[in-house]
């Protein structure tokens, strides 16, 4: 059973200012979500957006408030193993809030993977690759310097 849902708003400093067309970021704000289950297992999820409300209708601050105020009370007491039921309840009851819902789903998957002793990738059908390509964003405002 889901016993508690905790959120933490974190600002991760950037190496250098990250200049976007809509904002300059000196830190990346994100929300960490911890779901504590009655069997002692904890699952972690994350929600992040870029540039406050410039990226979409959710900001890190609204994600935290909406999880704390609306989502957590709705899912506390539900079966943490029944992820589809939890997510269906959220879909039926709460409009939008895709980033917040994703963080909840990720935390539930993390908890279930820990409970079963397998990585989340196995819960989702198995790992497809051993490494991922990395993108380096050129966003200092000085393209020549970035390159």
Locations of regions flagged by a protein language model:
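N-terminal capping/lid subdomain adjacent to the active-site entrance of alpha/beta enzymes
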Residues: 1-147
């Amino acid at each position: 059973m889901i016993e508690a849902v905790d959120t933490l708003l974190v600002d991760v400093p950037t190496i250098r200012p990250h200049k976007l067309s809509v904002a300059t970021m000196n830190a990346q704000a994100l929300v960490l979500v911890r779901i504590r289950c009655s069997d002692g297992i904890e699952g972690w999820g994350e929600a992040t957006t870029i540039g406050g409300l410039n990226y979409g209708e959710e900001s890190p601050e609204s994600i935290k408030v909406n999880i704390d105020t609306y989502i957590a009370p709705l899912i506390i007491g539900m079966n943490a193993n029944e992820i589809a039921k939890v997510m269906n309840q959220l879909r039926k009851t709460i409009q939008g809030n895709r980033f917040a819902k994703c963080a909840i789903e990720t935390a539930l998957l993390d908890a279930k993977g820990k409970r079963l002793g397998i990585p989340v990738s196995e819960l989702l059908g198995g790992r497809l690759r051993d490494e991922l390509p990395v993108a380096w964003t050129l966003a200092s405002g000085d393209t020549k310097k970035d390159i």
